[in-house]
Amino acid sequence: MAAMDTGQRADPSNPGDKEGDLQGLWQELYQLQAKQKKLKREVEKHKLFEDYLIKVLEKIPEGCTGWEEPEEVLVEATVKHYGKLFTASQDTQKRLEAFCQMIQAVHRSLESLEEDHRALIASRSGCVSCRRSATASRSSGGS
């Protein structure tokens, strides 16, 4: 039996030993298959964690070698993100200023049009009132 534990086999000419070896191999096969099933269940059980860790690794900023402190990497990523936000904010501010200037120009143009319209209406109504007074004075003077 001690010879079997070390991996050595008994004399191949002895048929009883062959049967014992075969029986031992079958038992070992069943044990290994059971162990394999158990390991497969464990792998499936931890598959969710593997998927999660893969997603986390995909989110780690580029250039992170693992030698840097995690805080440094986080600070660098935050600063980089802040830089992008700051640039976007400046661009948005410039666009807002351009729109404000455009709105002011449109308002000035609208005010000018309103003044011209009022002047035109006043000149027309002045002419109409002049015509009315001229017509009224003619009819009263000619009677």
Swiss-Prot record:
Checking InterPro entries in the record gives: CFAP_domain-containing
**Region ranges (Disordered):** 1-21
Highest taxon in the source lineage: Eukaryota
State the encoding gene: CCDC197
What is the protein named? Answer: Uncharacterized protein CCDC197
